[in-house]
């Protein structure tokens, strides 16, 4: 799995440039020649769109303008990658809804698997033309990590515009030293992450470490490297360690539990009491309506939500899971016995608000 950021593809005067993409394509080709399957997650659609329609670019960060720029630039982005390969390049656009909904998640996995079987090169991007929240808050680093787990990748390579992870921000601290390997993403390591390296993209070093943590939970190592360095890219193509290697977690979680833990959540929360919290964390129980204190947001049945304990200390997230009931229904059956669900609602989807098989404790 290779993730390429906007800063490596955007031309100085606008649009896309093959300057660094060529070396990355050669890295991909070397892996393909070695018999490995490769999936690319590539940013750059918005940057490409700015050159096509400067008038839209003048609108700045307005969501509608960025969506229009993404629509204009996505074809250019795919064309950039296709020029480097004889094999067909397949465009795959995903949203958080595709990753949050279990059926769509599995459909995406099946599609990517078939593309790889057919010998195509999937190039994935978020569908920024419709993903309002992703344009404001999202990034392709975390998308790459989730997709890496989706396709059961062996490694995640994140190409950036610096040499990897440093002990401090090298742009402001002359004593910063590069880290060749990171055995564990501790709080100390996360604190080393600075801000975004470029105004072109939306992800900084912090999001790359978050992505590495997500990939690591699935047993996938992450490599952060400087995609602007021809020497580094050539070294990687020859299986030499260049940049920062971030080890995978010692214990790999099951595929479904991984999805429950890392899939995007619907903006909504189920609030529980201390008794329910104990049942979830210590006994591995399902969440029953009697332990529910309320619900926030407007989630639907089947949505992924966070489960919070709210007490005198405050509110904190204890678990995530797929709700069997909508937010409105959860509020109506809160504090009630399971046998009261059908008399109250007029229907029942089962005695659990969240079944233990659809729940992961954080």
From Swiss-Prot:
Gene3D superfamilies: Acetylglutamate kinase-like, PUA domain. SMART domains: PUA. It comes from the Bacteria. Residues 267-348 form the PUA domain. Pathway: Amino-acid biosynthesis; L-proline biosynthesis; L-glutamate 5-semialdehyde from L-glutamate: step 1/2. Belongs to the glutamate 5-kinase family. This is Glutamate 5-kinase. It comes from Xanthomonas campestris pv. campestris (strain ATCC 33913 / DSM 3586 / NCPPB 528 / LMG 568 / P 25).
């Amino acid at each position: 799995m290779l993730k390429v950021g906007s800063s490596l593809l955007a031309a100085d005067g606008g649009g896309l440039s093959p300057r660094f993409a060529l070396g990355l394509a050669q890295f991909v080709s070397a892996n393909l020649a070695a018999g490995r399957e490769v999936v690319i997650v590539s940013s750059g659609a918005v940057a490409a769109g700015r050159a096509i329609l400067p008038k839209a670019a003048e609108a700045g960060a307005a969501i509608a303008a960025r969506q229009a720029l993404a629509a204009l630039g996505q074809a250019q982005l795919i064309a950039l990658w296709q020029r480097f390969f004889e094999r067909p390049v397949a465009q795959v656009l995903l949203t958080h809804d595709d990753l949050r909904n279990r059926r769509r998640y599995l459909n995406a996995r099946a599609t990517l698997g078939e593309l790889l079987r057919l010998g195509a090169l999937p190039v994935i991007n978020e569908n920024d033309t419709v993903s309002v929240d992703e344009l404001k808050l999202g990034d392709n680093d975390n998308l790459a990590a989730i997709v890496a787990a989706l396709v059961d990748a062996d490694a995640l390579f994140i190409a950036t515009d610096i040499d990897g992870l440093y002990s401090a921000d090298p742009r402001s601290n002359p004593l910063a030293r590069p880290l060749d390997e990171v055995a564990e993403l501790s709080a100390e390591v996360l604190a080393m992450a600075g801000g975004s390296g470029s105004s072109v993209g939306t992800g900084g070093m912090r999001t790359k470490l978050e992505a590495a943590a997500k990939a690591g939970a699935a047993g996938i190592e992450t490599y952060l490297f400087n995609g602007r360095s021809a020497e580094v890219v050539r070294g990687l193509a020859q299986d030499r360690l260049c940049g920062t290697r971030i080890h995978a977690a010692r214990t790999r979680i099951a595929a479904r539990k991984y999805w429950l833990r890392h899939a995007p959540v619907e903006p909504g929360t189920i609030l529980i009491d201390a008794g329910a919290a104990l049942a979830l964390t210590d006994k591995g129980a399902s969440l029953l309506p009697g332990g529910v204190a309320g619900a926030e947001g407007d989630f639907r049945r089947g949505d992924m939500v966070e489960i919070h304990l709210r007490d005198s200390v405050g509110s904190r997230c204890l678990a995530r899971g797929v709700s069997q009931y909508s937010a409105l229904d959860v509020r109506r059956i809160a504090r009630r016995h399971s046998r009261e669900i059908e008399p109250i609602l007029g229907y029942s989807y089962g005695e659990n608000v969240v079944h233990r098989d659809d729940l992961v404790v954080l």
